[in-house]
Amino acid sequence: MVFPMWTLKRQILILFNIILISKLLGARWFPKTLPCDVTLDVPKNHVIVDCTDKHLTEIPGGIPTNTTNLTLTINHIPDISPASFHRLDHLVEIDFRCNCVPIPLGSKNNMCIKRLQIKPRSFSGLTYLKSLYLDGNQLLEIPQGLPPSLQLLSLEANNIFSIRKENLTELANIEILYLGQNCYYRNPCYVSYSIEKDAFLNLTKLKVLSLKDNNVTAVPTVLPSTLTELYLYNNMIAKIQEDDFNNLNQLQILDLSGNCPRCYNAPFPCAPCKNNSPLQIPVNAFDALTELKVLRLHSNSLQHVPPRWFKNINKLQELDLSQNFLAKEIGDAKFLHFLPSLIQLDLSFNFELQVYRASMNLSQAFSSLKSLKILRIRGYVFKELKSFNLSPLHNLQNLEVLDLGTNFIKIANLSMFKQFKRLKVIDLSVNKISPSGDSSEVGFCSNARTSVESYEPQVLEQLHYFRYDKYARSCRFKNKEASFMSVNESCYKYGQTLDLSKNSIFFVKSSDFQHLSFLKCLNLSGNLISQTLNGSEFQPLAELRYLDFSNNRLDLLHSTAFEELHKLEVLDISSNSHYFQSEGITHMLNFTKNLKVLQKLMMNDNDISSSTSRTMESESLRTLEFRGNHLDVLWREGDNRYLQLFKNLLKLEELDISKNSLSFLPSGVFDGMPPNLKNLSLAKNGLKSFSWKKLQCLKNLETLDLSHNQLTTVPERLSNCSRSLKNLILKNNQIRSLTKYFLQDAFQLRYLDLSSNKIQMIQKTSFPENVLNNLKMLLLHHNRFLCTCDAVWFVWWVNHTEVTIPYLATDVTCVGPGAHKGQSVISLDLYTCELDLTNLILFSLSISVSLFLMVMMTASHLYFWDVWYIYHFCKAKIKGYQRLISPDCCYDAFIVYDTKDPAVTEWVLAELVAKLEDPREKHFNLCLEERDWLPGQPVLENLSQSIQLSKKTVFVMTDKYAKTENFKIAFYLSHQRLMDEKVDVIILIFLEKPFQKSKFLQLRKRLCGSSVLEWPTNPQAHPYFWQCLKNALATDNHVAYSQVFKETV
C-alpha cells in the first residue's frame, strides 16, 4: 500500500502545481518594466523569459525568481558576473548568444569591439542549470566554474582556437557540446586550430559533439564511446584513419561533408584537397558504426563508393552523397545492395563537368532499396526522361518523394508516373521541359536531338545544396537540424503532387496529362504558358484539388477556363499580369462560377484594371486574394459598373484587396461586398480617409486590416460602426489622436493594433476599462506619446492592466517633454501630477506667498520712494492738501556730502565750514552728519530731521557721490519739501564739472541759477564763490526764481 499512496501524493502535488501556475496566468507576478516576454509552459512546468533583441546593456531587474528558461540573445550586455543571476536559482537554460558577435560575422553598423567578459564562478551557483548557450560572444576559451549539472554547452562562433583537456575537466556530465564556427573563412582565426590528444576522453556522458567549420585537419583521437552524433563537416580533413571511429559503437549520426569539397560553382571561398583528390576513407573505417542511421558525405569529391563501407552499417536510414563526382557511380551503385534499411538517399549535383547526358542511367541496384521513401537526384543533367530510365524504381513500394529537379530535362514522358501509385511528390522543377506540336501521348517534349551536347548548367538555382552550412542557425534560433521541404506544404497536404514549375512550358493540352488522374496537386508556376484556356486542357486531372498557375501569361478570354477541374479547391493564378496590362483584351473574371467546390482563389499581382464581366460569381469560394491589382481604376469616381464585383461571391469570408492603390473608397463599395464577409484587408493602399459608418453594411465582419495607409482619424464611436468587429489593425498610419468615445461599448473587440502611428495622448474616455478588459492583445509601440501630467491616467492604466501589450517596456516610449524623452511610459514617475485637492491648495498657497514676498521685496528695493510719493500724491488729491506742522528751523543749512571721500570731507571741514561759520564775518549755523547727528538714532530718521530742521540743504556734489543711494534718499527728502510745503531748499555745489546731459540740472540753472554753484578752479575766483553761496543761504530761493517758475510753484 506504500507505493500506491506515494503515487497518489505525487499526483496531488502535480495537480496543485498546475492549478497554482494557472492562477499565475491571471495575476501580475513580475514587474511590467521588465523588457522581456514572460510565458508559462504548464505541461513542462517552465517559466520562460525571452529578452531577445531588446537593446539591453545589462541583465534587467525584475526577472521572476522562478524563471527556468532565460533568453538574452541579440543584446549588448558586456559582462557576466556571479551577481548577474542572483536569486535565479531555478534556471535550467540560459541562452546568451550574440551579445558580441565576431566583427566579420556581425552587423557592420554596430560592431562589437570588446569581447564578452565572464567572471569566474558566474554560473557555479546555478545548481539546476542544464543548458548554456554562449555562441557569438568572441570568447577566447571555455568558461570555467560551470555547474556540474550542465548537460548542454554551446560555444559556436567565438574565438576559441584551442581545445585542451584541462578546459573540459568541469564538464563531467556534459552530454551535448557545440564548438563549431570558431575558425573558418567568415570567422578567421589566422592560427592553426588545435585539439589536444585525448581532450574529450573524460567526457564519459558526451552524446553530441560538433566541431564543424573549424579548419580541423584530423578526426580527434580517442573520442568518448558514448557519442551518438558527431559533426565534422566543413573542415580540412583530407584523410580518415582506420581507427578514428573504432570505439564509437553507439554513433547514430556522422557528418563528414565539406572535407575535400567539390568547389565548382561554390558561392563561398572553397579550397579543394590537393589535385582535387577526394576525401580518403579506408574501406573498413565504418566497421565499428553498427548503430549508424545517418551518414552525410556531401561535397567530398568522391568518385567511387566502395560497398565495403556499408558492410556493418545495415541500420543506415539516411545517406547524403550529393555534390560529388558520382555520375558514373549512379549507373553501377553496387553499394546499394548493403543498405536494406535506407529511407532517404540524396545523389544530387553529381554531374560531370561540361557533359550533357542524353538520359539518366540508374543502376538496377536501386531496386534493392525496399525501404526507400525519398530519392533526390537533382543536378544529374540529362536531356530526356524515359520510362525505362526509372525502371529500377518501379518496385519500390515505399517510395514517396522523387526529386529530379534542376536537371535541364527537355523531354519527359509524364505518363510513366502512372506506375508509381505510392508516390506523393514528383519534382521536375527547374528543367527545360516544353510541349510538342503534335497530339501524341508522349507528354511534354521538344524536338530532341540524339547527340550528346556540351552544356554548362546553372546550378545556383537551389541554394539548399550550395549553402556553406545548411544546418547553421541564426542568432534568433537555437535548433540545429532544420528539415528541408522543396514542395509547397499547402499543396503537398492534398496528396500526390507533380511539380513542373520553372520549366519552358508555353502550351498545355489534355494529352499531356494522360494517365495522371491520380494527381491531387499540380504546380505549373514560373513557365511561359500564354494560351487561352477554354476548359479542356486539364480534363484528365479529375482528382486535382490544388493548381498553381502563377507566374505565367494566362489569357482569360473564356469564362469556361478551368471548368473541367470539378474537384479543384485551391487555384493560384497570381503574377499573370502580361495580358492584363494590355489594352482592349477580353478578361472574363466570372470563370469562378463554373468551379463548384473552389475554396480559395489567389489573383495577386496581376495589375487587373479592366474586366469584361462586371461581377465574379461563386457559391463555394471562401477566400479571395486580390492584392497588387488596380481597383483604383475599376472603382474610379463616377464609374459604378464594378462596385459589385465581389457581391455574388456568396460564401466569401476572407477578402484581401491590399496594394490596389485605393486612396479612397467610393460610397457604394461596401454595399457591393459579399454578405458573409468576415475578414477584409485593405492594407498598403494609401487610403487617406475611410467611411467608418459604411461598416454597418458588413454584418459579419470580424477582422479589418487598414495597416500601412495614410489615415489620420478613427471613428467617433467604433461600436456605432460595427457590432461584430473583433480584430482591428491600424498600424503604420498617420493617426495623431483618438476620438473621445473611440471604444465606448465595443465589447466584442479582442485585438487592436495602433502601433507605428503618431498618437500623442490617450484619454480615459477613449479607452473605457470595461472594454479594455475584454482585449487579448493591444499594440501601442512606436507612437509619439507626450508624457505630461495629462497622461497620468494612461500611465496608471498600463501599469495596472492585465491586457497583453507587446514591447511595453522597450518601445512604448515618450517623445517629450525633454526630461522624459526616450523613457518608457511604463517606468514614468508622475507623482507630482497627482490631483489631490489638499496638495493642490497647499502648493498654490505656498507659491502665491513666495511670489508675493518676492515681488514686495523687489519693489521695496527698487521703487519704494516712487510708491511712497504716488501714495501721498493720490492721498492729497483725494483729501486735499494739508500743510505739515514743522518745528522752527534750528540750522541755516544742512550740508550733505560724501563722508567716505577724504578729499571731499577735508574741503567741507577746511573750506566750507571755516568760511560759513567764521565768527569774524556773518556766520551761519550748519548741520553736519559727522558732527550733529544723534548717535544710536536710525540714519533715515537723522537724515529726515536734519532736512526738516534746516532752512536749506546744501549738496556737495561729485560724480561718484551722485550715484550713491545716500544722495538719492537725501535729495528725494529735500525735494519732498517742495511738494509738501512748496519750499525749495536745495542748493547744489559741484566740486567737479557738472553733468552736461542732466535735464534736471539744465532746467534748474535756467529757472533758479543762484542755487547751482561750481567750485572754481581759479583761486582768484574763490571769494566770489563764497559770496554767492552766502547770498543763496541768506536769501529765500523764490525771490531769485524766474517768473515762469514762480507761476509753476
Curated annotation (Swiss-Prot):
Instruction: Please give the Gene3D superfamilies that the UniProt record associates with this protein.
Output: Ribonuclease Inhibitor, Toll/interleukin-1 receptor homology (TIR) domain
- Where the LRR repeats fall, as residue ranges, is 43-64, 65-87, 110-126, 127-149, 151-170, 171-195, 203-226, 228-247, 248-275, 289-312, 314-337, 339-368, 369-392, 396-419, 421-443, 492-515, 516-540, 541-564, 566-588, 595-618, 619-644, 649-672, 674-697, 698-721, 723-745, 746-769, 772-795
- Similarity comment: Belongs to the Toll-like receptor family.
Q: Which residues form a coiled coil?
A: none
What residue stretch is flagged as signal peptide? 1-26
Protein name (record): Toll-like receptor 7
Q: Which InterPro entries match?
A: Cys-rich_flank_reg_C, Leu-rich_rpt, Leu-rich_rpt_typical-subtyp, LRR_dom_sf, TIR_dom, Toll_tir_struct_dom_sf
Enumerate the subcellular locations listed in this protein's record, separating them with semicolons. Endoplasmic reticulum membrane; Endosome; Lysosome; Cytoplasmic vesicle, Phagosome
PANTHER family of this UniProt entry? TOLL-LIKE RECEPTOR 7, TOLL-LIKE RECEPTOR 7-RELATED
Q: Which disease is it linked to?
A: Immunodeficiency 74, COVID19-related, X-linked: An X-linked recessive immunologic disorder characterized by impaired type I and type II interferon responses due to defective TLR7 signaling. Individuals with TLR7 deficiency develop severe respiratory insufficiency in response to infection with SARS-CoV-2 coronavirus. Death from respiratory failure may occur.
Asked if Membrane is a keyword of the record, the answer is: yes
**Transmembrane parts of this sequence:** 840-860
Q: Which is one Gene Ontology cellular component term of this protein? A: cytoplasm
Q: What is the predominant subcellular site recorded for this chain?
A: endoplasmic reticulum
Q: Which GO terms describe its molecular function?
A: double-stranded RNA binding; pattern recognition receptor activity; single-stranded RNA binding; siRNA binding
Extracellular-facing ranges: 27-839
Q: For side Cytoplasmic, which residue ranges?
A: 861-1049
Q: Which positions fall inside the TIR domain?
A: 889-1033
Q: What is the effect of changing Y264H?
A: In SLEB17; increased NFKB1 activation after stimulation with cGMP
Q: Known Pfam families for this protein? A: LRR_8, TIR
Give the record's free-text account of how this protein's activity is regulated.
Answer: Activated by guanosine analogs including deoxyguanosine, 7-thia-8-oxoguanosine or 7-deazaguanosine in a RNA-independent manner. Activated by imiquimod.
- Family matches, as SUPFAM superfamilies: L domain-like, Toll/Interleukin receptor TIR domain
State what this protein does: Endosomal receptor that plays a key role in innate and adaptive immunity. Controls host immune response against pathogens through recognition of uridine-containing single strand RNAs (ssRNAs) of viral origin or guanosine analogs. Upon binding to agonists, undergoes dimerization that brings TIR domains from the two molecules into direct contact, leading to the recruitment of TIR-containing downstream adapter MYD88 through homotypic interaction.
